[in-house]
């Protein structure tokens, strides 16, 4: 939503302002199996899973791997980016 869009804009602006000394990137996770979704109703969870092209909830380890990539030298030419890890849910019409 709005907060993710604000973070994405901030990342782009900061990356341009402080490069090449520091790389700035972010991760935008989708529905992830955490304590936070335990309070979600079963119906809402089912609907969100159904609206996700990969038809499942993500695992915290999957987000950790995305972050690990951004911290590694493998992403040394990546800056100003937001890696969306949401099972294909965003953007959907």
Model-derived features: positions:
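Alpha-helical substrate-binding/gating segment
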Residues: 64-76
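Short, flexible catalytic-loop segment of classical short-chain dehydrogenase/reductase
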Residues: 25-39
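A short C-terminal helix-loop "cap" of Rossmann-like NAD(P)-dependent dehydrogenase/epimerase domains
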Residues: 38-52
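Active-site helix of classical SDR
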Residues: 3, 11
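Alpha-helical segment proximal to the catalytic Tyr-Lys
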Residues: 12-20, 76
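A conserved structural motif in NAD(P)-dependent oxidoreductases
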Residues: 52-63
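Short C-terminal tail/terminal secondary-structure segment
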Residues: 68, 79-93
């Amino acid at each position: 939503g709005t907060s993710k869009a604000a973070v994405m804009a901030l990342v782009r602006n900061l990356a341009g302002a402080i490069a090449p000394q520091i790389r700035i990137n972010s991760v935008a996770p989708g529905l992830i199996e955490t304590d936070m979704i335990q309070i979600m109703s079963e119906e809402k969870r089912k609907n969100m899973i159904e609206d996700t092209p990969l038809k499942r909830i993500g695992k915290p380890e999957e987000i950790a791997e995305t972050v690990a990539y951004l911290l590694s030298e493998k992403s040394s030419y990546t800056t100003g980016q937001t890696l969306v890890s949401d099972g294909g849910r965003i953007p959907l019409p």
